[in-house]
Amino acid sequence: MKRNVSTVIVTLAVAFSAQLLPARSTTISRANTNQSKAFLATETFDGDYREIPKTSIARDGTKIASVKSYKDLHSLLVTLPPDEAMRSKYPGLRKSVKKPNWPAQREPEEIRNVRIKSCWIVSAKHEGGDGDRDFHVVVSNSPTNFSEVMNAEVSGLPKANTADFNTLRDVRALFLTLSTNAPSSSFTHLKPPKHVILEGSLYFDGYHGAGKKNDPGPAWAKPQSVWEIHPIYKLTPLN
């Protein structure tokens, strides 16, 4: 009889403890998520390839270049020079080129700031680990048809407190509020997509190719050009 009573007591104690664990675990998880987002919002750029263009807003001389608006992503894409033409005109943008022969500053075609009045963020990933700390953001002309997409990037912050530091820090923090969880190291499919107005500087990523299996982007929404908006310096959510 004593053994039965002891067994019942132990069973009840284990069951009671198990009921407490999920609530405690959830609290820790939420704290970690918030702490992680706060850390991610202030990460410094840790890449090597063309650091200055990636971490600064396009300028015409000493002034920020004028902004041209486009009604949608398609309207911007049709204005971009073909990848092959850019690599032919600027040999430093070819994939085989090694440092220090990369263009340190923006080429003339990259000195363009653009505003897309309507596009959808459909996927994103974080370049952590050995990456440069950027967020790769795939934007689409449509929330359901991913035939026209482009890579845009929320840059890691400049190493020095430059003129654009606060702007890039603020857009990085805003980007992290668009979903409950921060993007992981692989492309996450955002459901539903985030409808936004997006503003940033054009950038030709000669380091990569486009459209093939190992090129940037998820298989279901893979950009067909290495043209990017990099950095994004303003985001306005529309939904």
Q: Positions of the model-derived regions?
A:
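Bacterial N-terminal signal peptides that target proteins for export
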Residues: M1-I9
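Bacterial N-terminal signal peptides
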Residues: V8-Q19
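OB-fold and OB-like single-stranded nucleic-acid-recognition modules
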Residues: R24-N239
